Amino acid sequence: MRDTYVLSGARLATMEAEGSYGLVEDGAIAIQGDEILWCGARGALPDTYAACPSTDLNGRLVTPAFIDCHTHIVFGGDRAGEFEMRLEGATYEEVAKAGGGIVSTVTATRAASLDALVTGALPRLDALIAEGVSTVEVKSGYGLDRETELNMLRAARRLAEHRDVTVKTTFLGAHAVPAEYAGRADAYLDEVCLPTLRAAHAEGLVDAVDGFCEGIAFSAAQIAKVFDVAAELGLPVKLHAEQLSHQGGTKLAAERGALSVDHVEYATEADARAMAASGSVAVLLPGAFYTIRETQVPPVAEFRMHGVPMALATDCNPGSSPLTSLLLTLNMGCTLFRLTPEEALAGVTRNAARALGMQDRGRIAPGLRADLAVWDVSRPAELAYRIGFNPLYARVMGGKMEVRT
């Protein structure tokens, strides 16, 4: 068969079945172009593929390629200085008065050119790709003015031109109220955020719409206005909600059929029931939990009880989660949030794809995209168990296999 090859002699974690990794021992995968044609036990490989080129993976583990479904990797500047200040005892208010906090990132991002935003994001993207990532979600939200928000989304789109990766863009104009609109959140939404969303959509820059529903950001009623425009434009929504307190954002997101509700440390059982009914994914972000030394753990037991899918992501951002490792995120999800290793792996594959509304990836099955990761480990749990070690042997992106050097 033309342009078809076979990966064989692998232990496959197909992620097709919950609770067992969907394991296939001594497995094989037939790939044509960017599509998986067949997968299963090597002994059952159809004769159709007998003459195709084959690569023996010698017992290595193959999983779906990783998906980072919540990042802020496009931004200007850094916040290492305020990290030191916080460790020396400075309060949030003191950091802000010294020019730190999100204001410093907004200032640096507004000052950066489009090329500079792309150049700054590439090393962060490269770190993710080096750990088997094939798909990355990238948010705006550090411009908070029309041109910078648009430039952030343009930069995100350009990343896929520089690297072999799929990028999904999210408009996050309702991330914070900029200094020039202090105390006038509604005016900011009406005069800047919503017109910018319309402009970004008209330019083809937006795959989804997000917001930050929190006491320090926007109320549920204000986020509802953003979601109204998203619905008018035919865009799916997601929401940062219940991270620092309970504000009712999860209920709103579920009512609007959100793809995901993210952070959710303060979500309740009622929220879990609402998410289960709407099919929304709970995106857990242990990097931010760790960095800001949070103590309120997401209600994982309630999510399990009600069948809410759970994803994991880096939440890579300069302030609360300067994290560019999904492997470390797996470990954090298990040690901090008590996910099982299987739940963690599902969280960066099957459920991460669901959180982005992508049905063509995140599992190993015929008809799906051939985005795979090949690991020098024998047990899937090792991916979450080991710390500071990258066992990636090769990444298969759209059917093209690149062995890590």
From Swiss-Prot:
GO annotation, cellular component aspect: cytoplasm
Membrane-crossing segments per the record: none
Catalytic activity field: 4-imidazolone-5-propanoate + H2O = N-formimidoyl-L-glutamate
Compartments it resides in: Cytoplasm
Binding locations of Fe(3+): H70, H72, H240, D315
UniProt-annotated binding residues for 4-imidazolone-5-propanoate: R79, Y142, H175, Q243, S320
InterPro entries per record: Amidohydro-rel, HutI, Metal-dep_hydrolase_composite, Metal_Hydrolase
EC number: 3.5.2.7
A Pfam entry, by short name: Amidohydro_1
Family: Belongs to the metallo-dependent hydrolases superfamily. HutI family.
The name this protein goes by in its record: Imidazolonepropionase
Organism: Ruegeria sp. (strain TM1040) (Silicibacter sp.)
Gene name of the encoded protein: hutI
